[in-house]
UniProtKB/Swiss-Prot annotation:
Role this protein plays: Putative RNA-binding protein. Acts as a negative regulator of Wnt signaling. May be involved in regulating gene expression during embryonic development.
Lineage: Eukaryota, Metazoa, Chordata, Craniata, Vertebrata
The protein's name: Protein bicaudal C homolog 1
Keyword Repeat in record: yes
Pfam families (UniProt xref): KH_1, KH_BICC1, KH_BICC1_1st, SAM_1
Gene Ontology annotations of biological process type: determination of left/right symmetry; heart development; kidney development; negative regulation of canonical Wnt signaling pathway
Modified residues (N6-acetyllysine): 398
UniProt entry tagged with the keyword RNA-binding: yes
Species this chain originates from: Homo sapiens (Human)
Domain of life: Eukaryota
Disease linked to the protein: Renal dysplasia, cystic: An anomaly of the kidney characterized by numerous renal cysts and apparent disorder of differentiation of the renal parenchyma. Kidney of affected individuals lack the normal renal bean shape, and the collection drainage system. The cystic, dysplastic kidney contains undifferentiated mesenchyme, cartilaginous tissue, and immature collecting ducts.
GO molecular function: RNA binding
Length: 974
């Protein structure tokens, strides 16, 4: 290093053999070099190679020599020259600590083999590129200053701690029109990933909400008031108020940091409660993300599937701007509850594009098929191109942030390294990053098939729905510690959804398997639609879901927090309470949830322990996953005893089907607080004491397997006790009384005393079912009614989520009796022709639910005088008739139009359509009833049993009060 102080220090710049690029960092050829080069210039075996070495390592070598702590550069290169018989030119006058970060060049001359050997010896000590990567991430330009910090303090600290160089775009200083969001991080893989996480934690978190207008003279709250200052200091947030122009009221802005997310959420909730009081729960919270417009389509996915999935999962609304709007064209708005907005924000950030770049040695050849397999299994895009004028290849790996670990895993596989160099420890803490982002094995989007394929980056053929009967062994070949794909049982194919990451599977989860879902990979769009169609889209409603409408995983997690320590059993990852679709073996989850909740930690469903269901398709299980998207509505009392009894019979098909309901469909409304989480006619048949715990308003989607498969299972069921039938009849009587009570005009002189007569029966027209229905109707969200109105087919199909009409026999479990386990399937003498619309039954089995629909009743109970409906109908008005026919949900429609029974008997099919009865099955029921009643009315005066007491409504609407002892209803559809 003495050369630095000599007058010849800058002489290299004017050396005839140097150029402007070399400066002091380039090799300075000595006289000996020139002589040797000149003597052998024309030798055919002579070659010369120029390559870069790591500047920091060379500086460290020179520094150590100057301090007498190691050998000098001169000694190092001289030794190599002697051993390889080559000439080496190197920048001996390299300035230590210079501003330039460029790596200096080394030039080696000699025979080809000698040059190659010398280069390997030099690079073994001074090489950096083989383990150096560059990561380009997307950070909103509006937040660059916040990340950099005052005087660059924030980013300097990150660079020092991670050993990386972080570069923010210089073009943003001068270009006001187009701002770049790209931030580059260069360094070792572990440091680069750590820096990425740290940058995300430095991002600001801003939540906003509108203060309700209490009055014209209401002043804007003072942010300096003691209470607000106390909240601000306690939770380390800043609070400001913005007056809305031309309107009364104000917008509250809460600012915090991403690494303080939990405190920001708590502080915002406290502030809401302080400022809005009882209205706090009804006020939506909003935030916004600045995402480059060119990434919007990529993030939304095909047909918006990605965003829909996030909205349904979190319950937040997400609004992307109109691309034609020049102002704020990059701002994405999120609205919902505090929790849902923060979670949706994290999921969106997890969808931001990420690019990893690194060099590969020129001699390394990679099979294109291997690259294709890596791209599919790791959900990444890989591009390899040769570098001009350099003996190496440039590799570019693209993916999204939630899949970051897999990008390093792809690098490990391509370079043949033993480790990716990145550990899960570099992931953000659970407080700052929700499960599913930094730990992609818990990724909700990938688990629903919404990886890069869903985002539109990869082709449709790469969707990882493996329909072969043998597991894909690629991951095992890459890493022996990786959990294998689930092995199919009994030769049954076991398709899998998107594979979890290699880097994480050894310590987290394995592959999820969904039994009996045989859909080819080309049907991805269809699969996505099915997955999403039946799940209520909370994202479309501004208010947060009512208390009973929280997703089922929230209730499961509430059980986990009761000291049972089963989060690992549910999730396969100890730090994450998030449950992903399809991540848990569907045949045994419910049982394991119960076992774990009862303090039995021996049963867990970690990914490495998952097994396929052991049941045979002949047991009626083929429909187990068909209704993955159908809404469900279990109660949420947390009564694990009842739940255990219901889910633990020996019937695998029922347990599996109900578990799928629990995982996939329970985002429908929990309309009534009752004691059962799941219910099924088959299970209830063996549980008479529990059969009546479920409120009638809690809907169940109909699930009946094929007749041949069900008969053998139902044959041994115990007969129903008569008191259960009487209870069912009593319920219907109460329903009629409730309808009449609501229609009755209040009498001023009458004292009305509240009672609990209707408690728990779900008859209210105001809370909660009707309110939820009106709320969803206002937001164009489909509402699945309590009362079904169509003829249901006994077989199930994928179209059930869109179409509820199936002509034919077999009633679905949406009706009250089926849900309470007293449907036709509970009779001991159940006929073999369950699927037939005209099944015959013995007189002993003709109880209150002996018919599954109107046609069954007509065919099986019509007497010689044809007065069956006449005899069963002893009511006095239209609501009672509709209740008998299972059409109670349409009562309000006719009451609003002031249509009484007499007018109803004159209606035609076209009239019913105009009234809004669009469902074919319901109209057919009504028309058959009209026809039957009119026919009975004509026969009334000819009948010897005609009585003198008639119903109200005029001569044309008179019906006798004759009651048939064997019939409580014309229809089993309540």
């Amino acid at each position: 290093m003495a050369a630095q102080g000599e007058p010849g220090y800058l002489a290299a710049q004017s050396d005839p053999g140097s150029n402007s690029e070399r400066s002091t960092d380039s090799p300075v050829p000595g006289s000996e070099d020139d002589l040797v080069a000149g003597a052998t210039l024309h030798s055919p075996e002579w070659s010369e190679e120029r390559f870069r070495v790591d500047r920091k390592k060379l500086e460290a070598m020179l520094q150590a020599a100057a301090e007498g702590k190691g050998r000098s550069g001169e000694d190092f290169f001289q030794k190599i020259m002697e051993e390889t018989n080559t000439q080496i030119a190197w920048p001996s006058k390299l300035k230590i600590g210079a501003k330039s970060k460029k790596d200096p060049h080394i030039k080696v001359s000699g025979k080809k083999e000698d040059v190659k050997e010398a280069k390997e010896m030099i690079m073994s000590v001074l090489d950096t590129k083989s383990n150096r990567v560059t990561l380009k991430m997307d950070v909103s330009h509006t937040e660059h200053s916040h990340v950099i910090g005052k005087g660059g303090n924030n980013i300097k600290k990150v660079m020092e701690e991670t050993g990386c160089h972080i570069h923010f775009p210089d073009s943003n200083r001068n270009n006001q029109a187009e701002k770049s969001n790209q931030v580059s991080i260069a360094g070792q893989p572990a440091g680069v990933e750590s820096a990425r996480v740290r940058i995300r934690e430095l991002l600001p978190l801003v939540l906003m909400f509108e203060l309700p207008i209490a009055g014209i003279l209401q002043p804007v709250p003072d942010p300096n008031s003691p209470s607000i200052q106390h909240i601000s200091q306690t939770y380390n947030i800043s609070v400001s108020f913005k007056q809305r122009s031309r309107m009364y009221g104000a917008t509250v802005i809460v600012r915090g940091s991403q690494n303080n997310t939990s405190a920001v959420k708590e502080g915002t909730a406290m502030l809401l409660e302080h400022l809005a009081g009882s209205l706090a729960s009804a006020i939506p919270v909003s935030t916004q993300l600045d995402i480059a417009a060119q990434h919007h389509l990529f993030m939304m996915g095909r047909n918006g599937s990605n965003i829909k999935h996030i909205m349904q999962r979190t319950g937040a609304q997400i609004h992307f701007p109109d691309p034609s709007n020049p102002q704020k064209k990059s701002t994405v708005y999120l609205q919902g509850t505090i929790e849902s907005v923060c979670l949706a924000r994290q999921y969106l950030m997890g969808c931001l594009p990420l690019v990893l770049m690194f060099d590969m040695k020129e001699e390394i050849e990679v099979d294109p098929q291997f690259i294709a397999q890596l791209m599919e299994q790791l959900d990444v895009f890989i591009s390899i191109k040769p570098k001009p004028k350099q003996p190496s290849k440039s590799v570019i790996v693209k993916s999204v942030e939630r899949n970051a670990l897999n990008m390093y895993e792809a690098r490990k596989c391509l370079l043949g390294l033993e480790s990716s160099g990145v550990t899960i420890a570099t992931s953000p803490s659970p407080a700052s990053c929700p499960a599913g982002l930094a730990c992609p094995s818990l990724d909700i989007l990938a688990s629903a098939g919404l990886g890069l394929t869903g985002l539109g980056l990869l082709g449709p053929t790469t969707l990882s729905l493996n329909t072969s009967t043998t597991p894909n062994s690629l991951l095992n070949a890459l890493n022996s510690s990786v959990s294998p794909l689930q092995s199919p049982s009994s030769g049954t194919p076991s398709p899998t959804l998107w594979a979890p990451p290699l880097a994480n599977t050894s310590s987290a989860t394995g592959f999820s398997a969904i039994p009996h879902l045989m859909i080819p990979s080309t049907a991805q769009a269809t699969l996505t639609n099915i997955l999403l169609s039946g799940v209520p889209t909370y994202g479309h409603t501004a208010p947060s879901p009512p208390p009973g409408l929280t997703p089922v995983d929230v209730h499961i997690n509430s059980m986990q927090t009761e000291g049972k320590k089963i989060s690992a059993a549910l999730n396969g990852h100890a730090q994450s309470p998030d449950i992903k679709y399809g991540a848990i073996s569907t045949s045994s989850l419910g049982e394991k949830v119960l076992s774990a909740n009862h303090g039995d930690p021996s049963i867990q469903t970690s990914g490495s322990e998952q097994t396929s269901p052991k049941s045979s398709p002949t047991e009626g299980c083929n429909d187990a996953f068909v209704e993955v998207g159908m809404p469900r509505s279990p109660s949420h009392s947390g009564n694990a005893g009842d739940l255990k009894q219901m889910m633990c019979p020996s019937k695998v098909s029922c347990a599996k089907r109900q578990t799928v309901e629990l995982l996939q469909g329970t985002k429908n409304s929990h309309l009534h607080s009752t004691d059962r989480l799941l219910s099924d006619p088959e299970l209830s048949a063996t549980e008479s004491p529990l059969a009546d715990k479920k409120a009638p308003g809690s809907e169940r989607a109909a699930e009946r397997a094929a007749a041949a498969q069900q008969n053998s299972e139902r044959a041994h069921l115990a007969p129903r006790s008569s008191y259960v039938n009487m209870q069912a009849f009593d319920y219907e009587q109460k329903k009629l009384l409730a309808t009449k009570a609501m229609l009755k005009k209040p009498v001023v002189t009458e004292v009305r005393t509240p009672t609990n007569t209707w408690s728990g029966l779900g008859f209210s027209k105001s809370m909660p079912a009707e309110t939820i229905k009106e709320l969803r109707r206002a937001n164009h969200v489909s509402y699945k009614p309590t009362m079904t109105t169509t003829y249901e087919g006994s077989s199930m199909s994928l179209s059930r989520s869109n179409s509820r009409e199936h002509l034919g026999g077999g009633s679905e479990s949406d009706n009250w009796r089926d849900r309470n386990g007293i449907g036709p399937g509970s009779h001991s003498e159940f006929a073999a022709s369950i699927g037939s619309p005209k099944r015959k039954q013995n007189k002993s089995t003709e109880h209150y639910l002996s018919s599954s629909n109107y046609m069954d009743c007509i065919s099986s109970l019509t007497g010689s005088n044809g007065c069956n409906l006449n005899s069963s109908f002893k009511g006095s008005d239209l609501p009672e008739l509709f209740s008998k026919l299972g059409l109670g949900k349409y009562t309000d429609v006719f009451q609003q139009q002031e249509i009484d029974l007499q007018t109803f008997l004159t209606l035609t099919d076209q009239d019913l359509k105009e009234l809004g009865i669009t469902t074919f099955g319901a109209r057919r029921k009504m028309l058959l009833a009209i026809s039957e009643l009119n026919k009975n009315r004509r026969k009334l005066f000819e009948s010897p049993n005609a009585r003198t007491s008639f119903l109200e409504g005029g001569a044309s609407g008179r019906l006798p009060r004759q009651y048939h002892s064997d019939i409580a209803s014309v229809s089993g559809r309540w």
